[in-house]
Amino acid sequence: MSHTERIGQTPKAYVLANERGPFSVEVYLNPGTSNTYQYVATTRSKFNATDYDDLPWNYTSGKKVITANGVVSGGDRYVFALRSEIPQDIQVTMYNVNNGVSSNMNVRQPSDNSYYQPPPPPPPPRLVYNNGELYDNMINDTGYATELGKKLNDNFKKLWDYVNQPIVWLGVSALVGYLIYRYYYMSRPIGFGNSGAYDVPLLDTPLLRDSYRLPQSFTRDPIFRNSI
């Protein structure tokens, strides 16, 4: 990794290693001026944003090659810090030389703050069951139950949007009015108080018996009248 950074009195820090185990990193410093600067390799737990003077700073100037060795344990991180009384640009190049391999596997970009803290990696997607089928789901989703509830809410909202229209309410009001009319006006007794009798002709009354049962031509027949 190679990076040119403006170094001032507030330290800028680089993560040397954040993987558990021993490490060896070569740091090449190439300042743009002959002004002195300071460097230190230490653990992150000893490097804070309020007090830097208690760190074992090394004073130097010009080009410099530093080999930083250490062992990462307990989740701590090793950092390489730079500061300069007179602000200057310094090119920083780092190589991970663990096991003789030259790479920048453990090296991270510098920070704009007192020390660099890379963001944590995003959690992997969880595997949930959707109606018996396994599939990858988003982190904020809790699975099939949440998805089903969301669908029900969407369907209910669509139904309410359809029902909540003036023409629909007009139709519902007309239907309710018709049912009330049928129940209270078409089924109530007429002319006999509360006796329960309805205003419908009875078929076996003497007044209507002959004329109702047979046509008028039969009632005028003498044989029919005599037989009655």
Curated annotation (Swiss-Prot):
An example GO CC term for this entry is: membrane
Domain of life the protein comes from: Viruses
Q: Could you tell me the membrane topology recorded for this protein?
A: Single-pass membrane protein
What is its subcellular localisation?
Membrane
Region annotated Disordered, chain positions: 106-125
Membrane-crossing ranges are: 167-186
Q: Keywords in UniProt for this one? A: Glycoprotein, Membrane, Transmembrane, Transmembrane helix
Question: Which family does the similarity line name?
Answer: Belongs to the ascovirus HvAv ORF58 family.
Name of the protein in question: Uncharacterized protein ORF43
